[in-house]
From Swiss-Prot:
Belongs to the class I-like SAM-binding methyltransferase superfamily. CmoB family. PANTHER family: METHYLTRANSFERASE (PTHR43464), TRNA U34 CARBOXYMETHYLTRANSFERASE (PTHR43464:SF95). Its EC number is 2.5.1.-. The gene is cmoB. GO terms for biological process: tRNA wobble uridine modification. Catalyzes carboxymethyl transfer from carboxy-S-adenosyl-L-methionine (Cx-SAM) to 5-hydroxyuridine (ho5U) to form 5-carboxymethoxyuridine (cmo5U) at position 34 in tRNAs. The keyword Electron transport does not apply. It comes from Cronobacter sakazakii (strain ATCC BAA-894). Gene3D superfamilies: Vaccinia Virus protein VP39. GO terms for molecular function: methyltransferase activity; transferase activity, transferring alkyl or aryl (other than methyl) groups. This is tRNA U34 carboxymethyltransferase. Keywords: Transferase, tRNA processing.
């Protein structure tokens, strides 16, 4: 099993200590009752990875690690083989001892769009909701975060995160927990909460915003990145069965409507910070994610539309404060 004991020890004397009233029992129940059918296979790959300590570690500009003595061809091939058993890799990229994990998403591009608009992360305790393999957690650490906690119920992502952590020297400044936001008590303990690429997957988006608010300290900052459509404060797209081939897309508001939603939930100082059309340079099929990607989800004759005829993916970043 993956050991969360170090995380429990880490939070025992800080503002997250009251989480220990519920968290260990939740994780124990997950380990007992809810493991994915392939979890043992993924965990076996994780166990067989060497625990490396990098001589050069860059989390500020990328997630990359190097050793003073290059790995042998055999070592590198073995590590790459083990990492490939954890495919598909969706969020990255990672560069680890000469192995470049070219993920489906260039998550570094999103980070470059978000970072200029937020309160500096130095010394902050951070929650990243729907964190995937944890790429952005490492970038948060690189930006000076004291502690970056990610939650994501997808167990493959947890194993990918732990694999990267093992190759980064067992760094304990970032952690991923196999939970959804709805499983968290109202901690009111995080300085910054990120929700990126999650809102449109929620059946009740306003409930999601309230849940995010419940995790923030007073004057804490929410960083919300999500799909939007063009339009005024009354514009919300409710797709049919699929949007860009995704079945679980429920509401896509305009940025103006989303600003209203945030204010309705009690957030203040709401700013629409960035718009970005998703391109096939940012989301694409790679050797580490071999199934369909954005190019397959767009109308082959009109890239401004999805295959279903909806507007192609447009993403916005909004920043807000909990009073």
């Amino acid at each position: 099993m993956i050991d969360f004991g170090k995380f429990y020890q880490q939070i025992a004397c800080g503002p997250l200590a009251h989480w220990l009233e519920t968290l260990p029992a939740q994780v124990a129940a997950w380990q007992r009752d809810a493991l994915h059918g392939q979890f043992k296979q993924w965990k076996n790959s994780l166990d067989n990875l060497p625990a490396l300590v990098p001589d050069q570690l860059d989390l500020l500009h990328s997630v990359s690690a190097q050793s003073a003595e290059p790995l042998s061809d055999g070592q590198r091939k073995r590590i790459e083989q083990l990492l490939r058993t954890l495919m598909p890799w969706r969020k990255g990229p990672f560069s680890l001892y000469g192995i470049d994990i070219d993920t489906e998403w260039r998550s570094d591009l999103k980070w470059d769009r978000v970072l200029p608009h937020i309160t500096p992360l130095a010394g902050r305790t951070i929650l990243d909701v729907g964190c995937g393999s944890g790429y952005h957690l490492w970038r948060m650490v690189g930006a000076g975060a004291q502690l970056a906690v990610g939650i994501d119920p997808t167990q493959l992502f947890l194993c990918q995160f732990e694999a990267v952590r093992k190759l980064l020297g067992g760094d304990n400044r970032a952690h991923v927990l196999p939970l959804g936001i709805e499983q968290m008590p109202a901690l009111n303990a995080f300085d910054t909460v990120f929700s990126m690429g999650v809102l449109y997957h929620r059946r009740s988006p306003l409930d999601h915003l309230w849940q995010l608010k419940d995790q923030l300290v007073k004057d804490g900052e929410l960083v919300l990145e999500t799909l939007v459509v063009e339009g005024d404060e009354n514009t919300v797209l409710v797709p049919g069965e699929r949007y860009a081939q995704m079945r679980n897309v429920y509401f896509i508001p305009s940025a103006a409507a989303l600003k209203n939603w945030l204010e309705k939930c009690g957030f203040v100082d709401v700013k629409i910070a960035d718009f970005s059309v998703t391109t096939v340079e940012e989301q694409r099929r790679t050797a580490w994610m071999e199934t369909e990607s954005l190019a397959d989800f767009l109308d082959p004759h009109d890239a401004t539309k999805t295959r279903e005829g909806y507007p192609a993916p447009l993403r916005a970043v909004l920043v807000a404060r909990k009073p």
